[in-house]
Amino acid sequence: MIVGIGIDLIELKRIEAAFARQPRFPGRVLTSYEQDQMAQLAPNRQIEYLAGRFAAKEAFAKAKGTGIGAGLSWHDIEIRTEGSGKPYIVVNDDSARVHLSITHSKEYAAAQVVIET
C-alpha cells in the first residue's frame, strides 16, 4: 500500500550559488559516502549530483510527511546507486519500501519518491 508520495524540483543555478557562497554546503546535505562519490565526478557533473541528491532527500521528506527538520536530517537519508545506475534510498531505522527516481536537465534536477508499507 502506498503511504506517501513526494516530488521535488530544484534549479541547478540555486545549488551552484549555494555551493559558491558556502563551500561546506555539500557536507551539510550529503553523507560521507555521498561526498566521496561526488568528489570522483568531473566538476561540471558535481552540481548535477548535488542537486539530484538534494531533490531526492527533499522528495523523501515530503513523502514521509515530515520535511527536513528536528525528526529527519539530511544525513539520515543516503542515496546510493545500484550497478545498473538505478538510485535507491538508505534510511536509518526505516522498514518501508522506498522507490526513487532522479532526473537532470541542463537547468533542473528533479526527484520523485514513493513509499510503500
From Swiss-Prot:
One of its GO terms (cellular component) is cytosol. One of its GO terms (molecular function) is magnesium ion binding. Its main location: cytoplasm. InterPro entries: 4-PPantetheinyl_Trfase_dom, 4-PPantetheinyl_Trfase_dom_sf, ACPS, P-Pant_transferase_sf, Ppantetheine-prot_Trfase_dom. Mg(2+) binds at residues 8, 58. Its cofactor is Mg(2+). It is found in: Cytoplasm. It comes from the Bacteria. It catalyses: apo-[ACP] + CoA = holo-[ACP] + adenosine 3',5'-bisphosphate + H(+). It holds the Pfam family ACPS. Keywords: Cytoplasm, Fatty acid biosynthesis, Fatty acid metabolism, Lipid biosynthesis, Lipid metabolism, Magnesium, Metal-binding, Transferase. GO terms for biological process: fatty acid biosynthetic process; lysine biosynthetic process via aminoadipic acid. Its EC number is 2.7.8.7. Transfers the 4'-phosphopantetheine moiety from coenzyme A to a Ser of acyl-carrier-protein. Belongs to the P-Pant transferase superfamily. AcpS family. This is Holo-[acyl-carrier-protein] synthase. It comes from Shouchella clausii (strain KSM-K16) (Alkalihalobacillus clausii).
